[in-house]
Amino acid sequence: MTMESYKTLEIIRKNTDSSVFHLIINRPSHLNALSLDFFIEFPKALSSLDQNPDVSVIILSGAGKHFCSGIDLNSLSSISTQSSSGNDRGRSSEQLRRKIKSMQAAITAIEQCRKPVIAAIHGACIGGGVDLITACDIRYCSEDAFFSIKEVDLAIVADLGTLQRLPSIVGYANAMELALTARRFSGSEAKDLGLVSKVFGSKSELDNGVTTIAEGIGGKSPLAVTGTKAVLLRSREVSVEQGLDYVATWNSAMLISDDLNEAVSAQMMKRKPRFAKL
């Protein structure tokens, strides 16, 4: 399957035998600031990877010195100018709301992607970068990584997902403190808060370590992996009883599969399982 080219992103498959694909924010000269083009291209790229049977896991990273410096200020200014240019304030406000909803949907595309999306963070992860990683399924960073929920310093209420997703990751009080102060915090603090699962010593160690983890996930049953993601996301929004009912329904449809037979056979024969692509 031919990979489409993008202005703001790059898709790389580092090993032709691997089912791990890298989705890279590729605006290093702009510190990977998120432009309007990004919000159009990002969900398209994720959908392409989601539908590609060769893909089992996606690693999201940034080109150059930083993961993401937040929303592109020129794009932010453009949105503000367009929304205030009309004479009818009601219509201008409705237009702005549609733009915000469209940008929100671009971030939520991470959760809507069936395949696991792992964030590999180095350098700055600011504002919109935090929106991105809080939607990811797993997060890792290098020792030089730093984070900031920067929106209040731009007189904005963060509106692309951080305020909705971060409390369930780091706790309500921690999320409130970080969002109101906009303070910079380190990778080690992010680990202590539970925002990232591990801090690697360098970017190269991050790249190698996350790739190894992704390869491990990619070697498991794709039905089990995508199902686990779907059930966890669903369980976040419902009661325990409703979550149990959901997974019972899920497994009643998915459990009896060739993957189950292959996994059991591989365990008994002490060999690596071989699962069909999804």
Swiss-Prot record:
The record marks E151 as: Important for catalytic activity. CDD domains: crotonase-like. The keyword Lipid metabolism applies. It comes from the Eukaryota. One of its GO terms (cellular component) is peroxisome. Keywords: Acetylation, Fatty acid metabolism, Isomerase, Lipid metabolism, Peroxisome. InterPro entries: ClpP/crotonase-like_dom_sf, Ech1-like, Enoyl-CoA_hyd/isom_CS, Enoyl-CoA_hydra/iso, Enoyl-CoA_hydra_C. Pathway: Lipid metabolism; fatty acid beta-oxidation. Substrate binds at S69, G70, I71, D72, L73, G128. GO terms for molecular function: delta(3,5)-delta(2,4)-dienoyl-CoA isomerase activity. GO terms for biological process: fatty acid beta-oxidation; fatty acid catabolic process. It is an enzyme of class 5 (isomerase). Its EC number is 5.3.3.21. The keyword Isomerase applies. Disulfide bonds: none annotated. Expressed in roots, leaves, stems and flowers. It is found in: Peroxisome. A motif (Microbody targeting signal) lies at residues 276-278. PANTHER family: DELTA(3,5)-DELTA(2,4)-DIENOYL-COA ISOMERASE, MITOCHONDRIAL, ENOYL-COA HYDRATASE. Converts 3,5-dienoyl-CoAs to the corresponding 2,4-dienoyl-CoAs. Involved in degradation of unsaturated fatty acids. Belongs to the enoyl-CoA hydratase/isomerase family. This is Delta(3,5)-Delta(2,4)-dienoyl-CoA isomerase, peroxisomal. It comes from Arabidopsis thaliana.
